[in-house]
Amino acid sequence: MVRRDLLRGFVAVFALPAFGAEIVELKKSKEEWRKLLPESAYGVLFEEHTERPFTSPLNDEKHKGTFICAACFLPLFESSAKFDSGTGWPSFTQPIEGHIATKRDFALIIPRTEYHCVRCGGHQGHVFEDGPKPRGERWCNNGVSLQFVAADKPLPELRS
């Protein structure tokens, strides 16, 4: 085995917690989350508020990288899945597999599909069937529910 192959193996092992390994649920009370997060992020993530459109700098983010949950830091979307939907919220064609959970939302007259971080339960946004091909999905996210990590930066450790 060459040294380069050995190093690649170590890199793969350390990458497992973010991608591919079993995701362990992070349970915190609303009071604990309120102490950890800015009020605007807490309101969206754990009270299911919606931020105003065109207010998040992440709506215009075009660099390569990963969008992570602002609460627990689980990677949720790759920048390659981001597109400009014209809605004023960061939008994606698909999430990272296994990192998002969905449920029906009946808060408005028309039922919608809400999605949240599978690890901490933080509300992210809603998925609609008006996105670009091939999937036709628009994962419409509240920017305050996400943080962006540029491709040349390491992902933070998952919050405990």
Predicted regions and their residues:
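N-terminal secretory signal peptides and thylakoid transit peptides that target proteins
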Residues: 1-14
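Boundary at the C-terminal end of the N-terminal hydrophobic targeting segment
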Residues: 18-20
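A short Gly-Trp-Pro
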Residues: 25-28, 32-160
